[in-house]
Amino acid sequence: MRKRTLIVLGILLASFVIQSCSSSPERGIISRYFNAVRMNDNATMASMALEPAQWDVASWDIVSVSPEKIEPMTLPGLTKAEADAKKAQDGQIGPTMDADTVLQNAKDEQDLARSAGAKAVAKKKVDEAQAKYDTEYAKMKEFKTNYTNAKAAASAEEQIALFSLGLRELASIRDLSGNVHSKDVVVNIKTTQGQVKSYRLPMRMYELKNDAGQKLPARWIIVKFEPVV
């Protein structure tokens, strides 16, 4: 087990060194990945792809490589969007509960109404309170959905960044600055059964700096394998 761990760590270290010296790392990375697939080396596959996949591969080839993009790290912005969405959701709790209280009180009054006139007035109050509650509840659902989506987006980006850095966790990851390199690679995979399958491989590398301004070791990684229809 210790030997297997040392081998995986060696592969990770080698990938850092090789990728830093190569402007077109995708062929080497993908070649090493498919070698691991053929050897059924799950540990190596899991060290190279955030969402690894496996087939009975006879051969493979690269169909296309998109131009490399270099963009600022988005995680700080996604973290702020998550915080803003949570604030909006939490701020809507009070108005929704207040509207519900008014609605329940109106329904109680309606239950106690006896005369036709009192019932008509009570029904109008219930209808108005129901409309108000429906409006506030719809806002609550929207804010909750927005927060759920924002939280998921920030978490997903955090996991990709950590994976590129070769780390399981880093307390300050959401506060780091730097650039994200990305490209899409399309590959054709021929299985041992003769089937040819096409996949798009989003690839990323995060070049980030810590609080002291020092660059953190970065490597290209495969995010996932997306079937090309």
PLM region spans:
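Alpha-helical linker/edge segments of TPR/alpha-solenoid repeat scaffolds
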Residues: 73-90
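Short, charge-rich amphipathic alpha-helical segments embedded
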Residues: 53-71
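C-terminal motif of bacterial Sec signal peptides marking the signal peptidase cleavage site
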Residues: 19-20
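Exposed beta-sheet edge and beta->alpha loop/turn motif
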Residues: 89-229
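Short, well-ordered alpha-helical segments enriched in acidic and aromatic residues
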Residues: 41-56
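Positively charged n-region of N-terminal signal peptides that target proteins for export
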Residues: 1-4, 10
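Short, aromatic-enriched amphipathic alpha-helices that serve as compact interaction elements
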Residues: 25-40
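Bacterial N-terminal signal peptides
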Residues: 9-16
